Amino acid sequence: MLQPKKTKFRRQQKGRAKGNAQRGNQLAFGSFGIKALETKWITGRQIEAARIAVTRYMQRQGQIWIRIFPDKPITRKPADVRMGKGKGSPEGFVAPVTPGRIIIEAEGVSYEIAKEALRLAAQKLPITTKFVVRRDYDIQNQNA
């Protein structure tokens, strides 16, 4: 499961993710990717499930990049505990995602394989996504 090796503080305030992604909103490494269309927290387990789905479908060909990392700690209080008495203990980590953020990128496979692999990955995530292709990529003249 993805999580930071070390954090400065054990707990963090919830905060609100407003607006669109200001960085990480364009393809940087691969020719294909999936882009988030809504705001949500994505857990490390969900990212790992998406990564496994892509890797299995691509049969370990090509290369993938995970562009988000769960570095925000989430706390939970135990069941049957009354309000108050402090913040709960850390339970896991999430990656806050805003619209426009590239989540996964792929390279080194054909257009059809990449589209299906990233569709399978998108099904593992709790948000709606969109398949994106690099602007200068020529679908008719694939060299992959």
UniProtKB/Swiss-Prot annotation:
SUPFAM superfamilies: Ribosomal protein L16p/L10e. Keywords: Ribonucleoprotein, Ribosomal protein, RNA-binding, rRNA-binding, tRNA-binding. One of its GO terms (cellular component) is cytosolic large ribosomal subunit. The keyword tRNA-binding applies. InterPro entries: Ribosomal_uL16, Ribosomal_uL16_bact-type, Ribosomal_uL16_CS, Ribosomal_uL16_dom, Ribosomal_uL16_sf. The keyword Ribosomal protein applies. Belongs to the universal ribosomal protein uL16 family. Binds 23S rRNA and is also seen to make contacts with the A and possibly P site tRNAs. NCBIfam families: rplP_bact (TIGR01164). This is Large ribosomal subunit protein uL16. It comes from Bacteroides fragilis (strain ATCC 25285 / DSM 2151 / CCUG 4856 / JCM 11019 / LMG 10263 / NCTC 9343 / Onslow / VPI 2553 / EN-2).
